[in-house]
Amino acid sequence: MVQCLDGVRQLLAVVFKCCDLELKQPRGLEDPQVLARETVFSVSEVEALYELFKKISSAVIDDGLINKEEFQLALFKTSKKESLFADRVFDLFDTKHNGILGFDEFARALSVFHPSAPLDEKIDFSFQLYDLKQQGYIERQEVKQMVVATLAESGMNLSDEIIESIIDKTFEEADTKHDGRIDKEEWRNLVLRHPSLLKNMTLQYLKDITTTFPSFVFHSQVDDT
């Protein structure tokens, strides 16, 4: 009987300990220390980022997850504006490929946009943005799709002739292997020569995430060089 009671006490101790942990750690928030080790965010930044995540995830459906509509709303302040850029970013954030973002996906993916994120991570992510077919290289049509989409989002209207000229110049410089496509190595070399290609890959206000919650907005702009 004594042994039985001891067993019950041990079981209750475990239950209370688990309940205590759940109370201390918000539902949906992975261990901040784990995320801090796997991203460029500090523990306090991870916790602040979670507050931002909760605001975005409750914009349409308060379920603790971000769907594409909420993502669009956070990006462009409207859920109706179609954007190839936003679609690509969402798809790359959605590593589980289930059409929704949990906080772990949100934090890990957003880490690449932090000013302190390694350059190689930014280059790799930007390459994936253009690699629409996920073939490991960028084709001419993919570049055109992104250029046209970026121009439209920026409110700029260029003739097809000028757009084709821009793409011609891009491939003339980037496609050093002359095979009609841009691979990761060629993309990296192009970006290193033209760092402005990565200007959309850095969100300066992520440095101040612990003190303020700025609008989560990517400003898609055309390279002005």
Curated annotation (Swiss-Prot):
MF GO annotations: calcium ion binding; kinase binding
PROSITE patterns reported in the protein's UniProt record: EF_HAND_2 (PS50222)
GO process terms (BP): calcium-mediated signaling
Induction annotation: By gibberellin.
InterPro entries noted in UniProt: CNBL1-10 (IPR045198), EF-hand-dom_pair (IPR011992), EF_hand_dom (IPR002048)
Coiled coil regions in record: none
Keyword terms of this UniProt record: Membrane, Repeat, Vacuole
EF-hand domain mapped to chain residues: 45-80, 81-116, 118-153, 162-197
A Pfam entry, by short name: EF-hand_7
UniProt entry tagged with the keyword Nucleotidyltransferase: no
Tissue expression from the record: Expressed in roots, shoots, culms, young spikelets and scutellum.
Keyword Membrane listed: yes
Domain of life of the native organism: Eukaryota
GO cellular component: aleurone grain membrane; vacuole
Subcellular localization, as worded in the UniProt entry: Vacuole, Aleurone grain membrane
UniProt-annotated site: Involved in dimerization, residues: S154
Described purpose of this protein according to its UniProt entry: Acts as a calcium sensor. May promote vacuolation of aleurone cells in response to signal induced by gibberellin. CBL proteins interact with CIPK serine-threonine protein kinases. Binding of a CBL protein to the regulatory NAF domain of a CIPK protein lead to the activation of the kinase in a calcium-dependent manner.
Similarity comment text for this entry: Belongs to the calcineurin regulatory subunit family.
Summary of subunit composition and partner proteins: Homodimer.
Protein name: Calcineurin B-like protein 2
